[in-house]
Amino acid sequence: MELSLSIASFPLDSETILDMRELLKMSDRDYSKPLFESSWHLADVPGFAVLAYTENNELLGFAAAADLIGLDSYEWSAFVHPDYRRLTIGSALAGGVAYGLQQRQAVEGLAAFIEEEGAKDFIASLGYQPDFKEIELEAEPLAEFKLPEGLTIIPYDGEIEKLENLMIAAFDEDVLPVVHYNIEKNDREVFVMKREGELVASASLIKEEDESGLWLTAFAVDPIEQGKGYGKAFLLWCRLYAMQQGKKRAVLEVETDNDALTVYRKSGFNPVHTIEYWKKP
């Protein structure tokens, strides 16, 4: 069997996207997130796909890589037809990714795979080493919720210095490009929580185009204000907002060693799967 490998930049054409989606149906697991399915058709997301077609134009595997925050820092993942995983298709796709990253002068190329033994063996065989893990959690939308007295949640109001200080306190200065990216992107909404006019928390929300989910990113509570229930209140409000927007679930990702993991669970968010990130030394 002869295979032809090609690289296509985002946005991908509709026929290719259809082939990729049909291939993903070969698995019971949902690989759409690490493979950036929601970005395949977008012209403003730097990304590309490596495609492995047979001589009969059957797609047997593909990899997808994307730079989600515009800093030349890519993540990538791959999927191969379950009946052909003993071949070297995965390694060929990884080689295509490496070439694509080199052509784009990427400063980083993290591999992201749902945590499972087959994926671990594959990515380790390519010389990658484990870096960190994130748990994807989801919650059902809430039909009713009322913020505690004195708290308000409003769209970002332009007070950039206060927002930057909050995010630096919760993370570090490396988060600032992400903050500005979230503010500038039209497909993201930044909300802030205030207590009697003072900023105490923030989150960025992204609506999945198929109306299935509302993603929470860059969620932060002022460290000085942690432990007072603000984080839980914000998360519950996000579930309410998901209902108001007609979404079927609210979703977020958090590193497995994050101290706030218990807060997410107490707010109704339950684990879906763990994505393991790998890097080359």
Give the location of each predicted region.
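Conserved N-terminal entry element of GNAT/NAT acetyltransferase domains
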Residues: M1-L18, Q129, E138-G158
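Acyl-donor-binding surface of acyltransferase catalytic domains
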Residues: P82-E149, I275-K280
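Conserved acetyl-CoA-binding loop-helix of GNAT-fold acetyltransferases
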Residues: R86-Y99, S125, V221, G227-L240, ...
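Short acidic/polar active-site loop segments enriched in Thr and Asp
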Residues: V107, K248, N270
